[in-house]
């Protein structure tokens, strides 16, 4: 879909120089001499490389049309992840590397968002919040309750995270996956 460069927004995906680029940030600039332009910070979806591009504000850019579908995680075999569409029961396989560091969060029956461009899978995402059990943590140190303090913990999948002092071994917690941070304790 062709648009003016003035309409670029962070989060959009553009077709540019033969690749797909996710817009990270933009800055409109009106110099004292010459025409206005847009400075865009972009990330190549295939390679992950950051890229800076300057567009004239009246230039035409092409926004990529992406399809996003939710699949259910079945199992991992080597470097291959098997997923199933919840309504059609169609099974697909994706490369484990598409999930990056987030592959440690995979759990049975987890919903995985798969993004495609022209019927080719370009990315996959785990949910923003995942429930995990605390496998190992330090005991509470008395007198450290004046300010919000955190202690290290190891979760069932081996990830290390800082948790509040009241969390004990065996507690279930919700983890915020985009930044690997504690979100809340599961209420039972």
From Swiss-Prot:
Gene Ontology terms: cellular component: cytoplasm
Major place of residence: cytoplasm
Transmembrane segments: none
Intrachain S-S bonds: none
PROSITE patterns per UniProt: EFP
Residues in the signal sequence: none
Gene3D superfamilies: 2.30.30.30, Nucleic acid-binding proteins (2.40.50.140)
GO molecular-function term, one example from the UniProt record: translation elongation factor activity
Superkingdom field: Bacteria
HAMAP family (UniProt xref): EF_P
Family per similarity comment: Belongs to the elongation factor P family.
Name under which the protein is recorded: Elongation factor P
